[in-house]
């Protein structure tokens, strides 16, 4: 999705897409997007990067499968930390990917964090 600076793009639901990922808020312009579920297919996950929105913009957690952020912005926390709210479907997908034989570096192992 491409848009001019300072505007919000719109995701389009497409057949065969299994993850819709987008930022809740664009840091440099402050443009925010509503947190809402995309995709009608039951396996389609909605993943939201909330690094510059967490704690500052209300949202309905049931509208996303993964809402993740690093606390160094809105929470003035140390860098290098990462938090995520994950639905059961997202956790199940993480384990499925980990069990698929795909190489995942240990420092990127989501299942190690769960």
Language-model regions: role of each:
Residues 72-114:
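Active-site C-terminal subdomain of aminotransferase-like
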Residues 40-45, 60, 91-93:
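Secondary-structure boundary elements
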Residues 61-72:
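Conserved active-site segment immediately N-terminal to the catalytic lysine
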Residues 31-35, 56-62, 78-82, 93-97:
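A short secondary-structure junction signal
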Residues 3-51:
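Active-site phosphate-binding strand-loop segment of PLP-dependent enzymes
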Residues 16-18, 65, 80-82:
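A generic secondary-structure signal marking the coil-to-beta-strand transition
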Residues 29, 33, 52, 59, ...:
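Flexible, active-site-adjacent loop/turn segments at secondary-structure boundaries
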């Amino acid at each position: 999705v491409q848009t001019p600076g300072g505007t919000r793009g719109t995701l389009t639901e497409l057949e065969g897409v299994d993850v819709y990922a987008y930022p809740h808020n664009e840091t440099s312009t402050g443009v925010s997007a509503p947190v809402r579920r995309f995709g009608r297919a039951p396996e389609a996950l909605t993943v939201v990067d909330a690094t510059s929105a967490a704690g500052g913009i209300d949202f309905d957690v049931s509208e996303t499968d993964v809402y993740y952020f690093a606390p160094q912005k809105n929470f003035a926390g140390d860098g290098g930390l990462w938090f995520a709210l994950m639905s059961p479907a997202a956790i199940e997908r993480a384990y499925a990917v980990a069990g698929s034989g795909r190489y995942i570096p240990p420092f990127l192992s989501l299942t190690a964090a769960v």
